[in-house]
Amino acid sequence: MCIRDRLCITALCGALSACSAPRIDGRAESEHQPSACESAYWAADASTATMNGRHHIIMRYLAAKQAVGQWSEVAATCTQRFAQGTIRSAQAEHMAVTLGTRLGGNDTYRTVSDDSLRQVLGIDLDGATLGAMSLAEDRAGFVMEVLAARDTPGATLSRSDRHKTAGQLLFTASGLSRDPREKVYDIQKILASPTSMTDSTTGLSVPTTALTEIDCAREQLAAMADDGASAKSKHTDKTGNNTNGNGDTDSATDTTDVNATDTNTVGTENDARLRVLSTLISSHITSAFALGYPDMDAFLFS
């Protein structure tokens, strides 16, 4: 081989080594590991599409049943989708109960037990958030008690008691020294319109009992949003990156496997507590549906 040929080969090799490897279409996408939030959202969205699609009623019913829990998972694991997951879960549950009835079933709406609410103790939320939620429960309980005394359809003392008990448990979980619940509230508008009222948010005329439930849910969702999009991670974002609370990735390199395990455990426990709160709020929304509040997006999403 002549010297000139060797020089050409050397130059060619140098040029090739300076080039980056060609990108294979789809490779990066296929190697991407979806986060818990992404997995939950995609599953919930797919089930909802089937639920609302032109499918056999049994397929729609089963999809609705699946979507209930999947949207609750979205609420718990997606830092910016607590309200969406909670409302969608309620809509899916209402659809499941409606379709189940048409199929001759005996489906009922979810409720949250006192023991489940006690598990909220220790959740990574500001005490003021739980305090605001307890206030919403107590107010709804008081209104329901007044309406039950006036024999308003749908208003019962048991419904009132559930709200008040939830309010007490949420206040206990808040750790606040001052109780935000007022116990007695201004109900002049309720007394003037015990059967139906105009919803100030939508302008709809709806049953007063239904409005009481939906207003309770709205107050609680607003409290969660004020907290920072439902416990927006002070420790771990839902994609698995440690954060400092401002969304910046923590560059610390001395975290041990034990600490990582502890963080994952805390995150899992917090997600479980968020599911309880999401289900509680969803139960108020489904109660509103059962009492006559419309379940369309236009009246539920601001």
Feature locations, PLM:
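Conserved small/polar residues in nucleotide/adenosyl-binding loops
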Residues: 1-6
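Short, positively charged
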Residues: 12
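All-alpha RGS (Regulator of G-protein Signaling) helical domain and cognate RGS-like helical scaffolds
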Residues: 20-302
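C-terminal motif of bacterial Sec signal peptides marking the signal peptidase cleavage site
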Residues: 15-18
